[in-house]
Amino acid sequence: MSKPIQMERGVKYRDADKMALIPVKTVVTERQELLRKPEWMKIKLPADSTRIQGIKAAMRKNGLHSVCEEASCPNLSECFNHGTATFMILGAICTRRCPFCDVAHGRPVAPDANEPEKLAQTIADMGLRYVVITSVDRDDLRDGGAQHFADCIAAIRAKNPTIKIETLVPDFRGRMDRALEILTETPPDVFNHNLENVPRVYRQVRPGANYEWSLKLLERFKEAHPHIPTKSGLMVGLGETNAEIVEVMRDLRRHGVTMLTLGQYLQPSRHHLPVQRYVSPAEFDEMKEEAMAMGFTHAACGPFVRSSYHADLQAKGMEVK
């Protein structure tokens, strides 16, 4: 019997090293390896990368992280070129090891107590009017990182009084009561928590997470803050069916969620879960029609949509795909 891997604190485990730590193994078949991206999945890079390099430099200068870079988001060039970014707090090492995600796994260091102030100043320097704050999972913290979220929100608003803040939070596994109590003190303008996919594939796609728990988190926040929109998103192409996606949409509406994002899953590396199918733009349009008919006030559905992709436009109800 092989010895368990001894993880060093502060070390990022990625790709094969990360996947080796997952109890439900990822099996890539020859057919899946041959699945090629269709034409609609091709990305055009901007000719001028000056703004992109400027945002990266600002992040490095202040020791901040963006989920855009850490999760290898396909929209990084477009978003950075438009002067927008999704800030990732609580470090760049996640205590979970989801096989669809490119964020590093490991034993994270203690949260940076100066991060809220550095984040607030960076946002002020960039002149942003709408920001998305997300984080890695921090199962090592007694509140799951909720107090750090609250501190960041308070610091950002102190320096940027008119700004709109969207939080994309983890599930606060085992700590929901405490986390919601803390977030009640400084709630965001939009509360986002992603279900990621349908319950049938959770054991493989989101090991360590629970579908019903995530729905309950969204519902309880909405009950405490009925005036604040709640939002959730799914990746498609991981073995689910369109009928299952529609059922998840119904579950979200039953739990008070009014904003939805649906986007195509893309395999970050050959070590991650393979793409099972590519969903066409026409299918995404049909899903959006279904969502709006169910009563969602906002539904961004398209191949490149991510939960924070043009989040400011999503919040205004403008079409994003």
Swiss-Prot record:
Record domain Radical SAM core: where: 80-297
Binding site for [4Fe-4S] cluster 1: C68, C73, C79, S308
EC number from the UniProt entry: 2.8.1.8
Keywords associated with the record: 4Fe-4S, Cytoplasm, Iron, Iron-sulfur, Metal-binding, S-adenosyl-L-methionine, Transferase
UniProt keyword Thylakoid, yes or no: no
Organism domain of life: Bacteria
Assigned protein family: Belongs to the radical SAM superfamily. Lipoyl synthase family.
Protein name per Swiss-Prot or TrEMBL: Lipoyl synthase
Gene: lipA
